[in-house]
Curated annotation (Swiss-Prot):
One Pfam family, short name: Hydrolase_4
Active site per database record: H29, S98
Family: Belongs to the lipase/esterase LIP3/BchO family.
Single GO term (MF): carboxylic ester hydrolase activity
Disulfide pairings: none
Highest taxon in the source lineage: Bacteria
The organism of origin for this protein: Mycoplasma genitalium (strain ATCC 33530 / DSM 19775 / NCTC 10195 / G37) (Mycoplasmoides genitalium)
Enzyme Commission code: 3.1.-.-
Enzyme class name: hydrolase
Leader peptide range in chain numbering: none
InterPro entries: AB_hydrolase_1, AB_hydrolase_fold, AB_hydrolase_sf, Hydrolase_4
Name the record gives this protein: Putative esterase/lipase 2
Length: 268
């Protein structure tokens, strides 16, 4: 069993390694979530026999921790970097959601030669945390003509999201430290995250956003990230919010396939 420190990295790890491939993927989950949030995408990766690793960050899922030193964004970055180096991984493609997207960008800043490409899903950035309470409540509870079909079809998912929110609230003492650290990192002028986004440069990067995201503002994020690199490919999925990989897994995967096909043609 792996633990969350510099010697043995994670308390929980899930790996799919069918055979040696040129690329290896690492999934990085978001704040208050866990790697199971990618489960619908895992099944599509398995069908392609693409190798991947994923794990729960300290304080998330079954990786319990109340150590405030471990509940910091930079600690998560160190853990991922150490994991990649210790496993001697190359041609790594990081797939990071929300907070995990920020971790991915920061990892690329530290060990850029190990990272082949970035797939950022509603990534935390300097436009994040402009959350409107009314929009959150409307997303969960308000039904109207424009969203009726989506509301009915995703009733179980809505309940699941509420469950996650309730569980996060129950663990608010644990997440208080991490949340404060995230907000600090996402502030305009935070040199570390700002430089990390600027260092994307020519690195092949796909950004997938939900049109109805209440956490990572879609248009503001596109404007912000496009200013950091003109090589970023943006895909916006209509009718979904902060977790497009879970709400629209097939379309999400199609975008990933298209991105990887282009990557192959460009011989990165």
């Amino acid at each position: 069993m792996l633990t969350s420190n510099k010697n043995t990295l994670f308390n929980s790890i899930f790996a799919f390694k069918p055979k040696k491939r040129k690329n290896v993927f690492i999934f990085l989950h978001g704040f208050g979530s866990e790697y199971a949030s990618f489960s619908r995408i895992f099944s599509l990766f398995k069908k392609k026999k693409w190798p991947f690793f994923t794990f729960n960050f300290p304080g998330h899922g079954d990786n319990e921790s109340t150590d405030t030193d471990q509940l910091k964004l930079n600690h998560f970055v160190d853990l991922v970097c150490d994991f990649i180096v210790q496993k001697k991984l190359n041609n790594v493609i990081l797939i990071g959601h929300s907070m995990g997207g920020a971790v991915a960008v920061l990892v690329n800043k530290v060990i850029p030669l190990k990272i082949k490409a970035l797939i950022l899903v509603a990534p935390m950035n300097q436009t994040s945390f402009s959350v409107n309470k009314k929009r959150i409540l409307d997303t969960f509870f308000k039904r109207n003509n424009s969203n009726h079909k989506d509301f009915v079809e995703h009733e179980e998912k809505r309940k699941s999201l509420l469950k996650i929110a309730i569980n996060a609230f129950k663990k608010r003492t644990t997440f208080k430290t991490l949340y404060s650290d995230m907000v600090q990192n996402a502030k305009y002028g935070n040199d570390s995250l700002e430089r990390a986004y600027e260092m994307i440069g020519n690195k092949p990067t796909l950004v997938i956003l939900g049109a109805n995201d209440i956490v990572t503002p879609t248009k503001a994020s596109v404007d912000y990230l496009a200013n950091k690199s003109d090589k970023i490919i943006f895909k916006v999925i209509d009718g979904v919010g902060h977790s497009p990989h879970d709400s629209a897994p097939k379309l999400f995967f199609d975008y990933v396939l298209e991105f990887l096909d282009n990557l192959k043609k460009q011989r990165y």
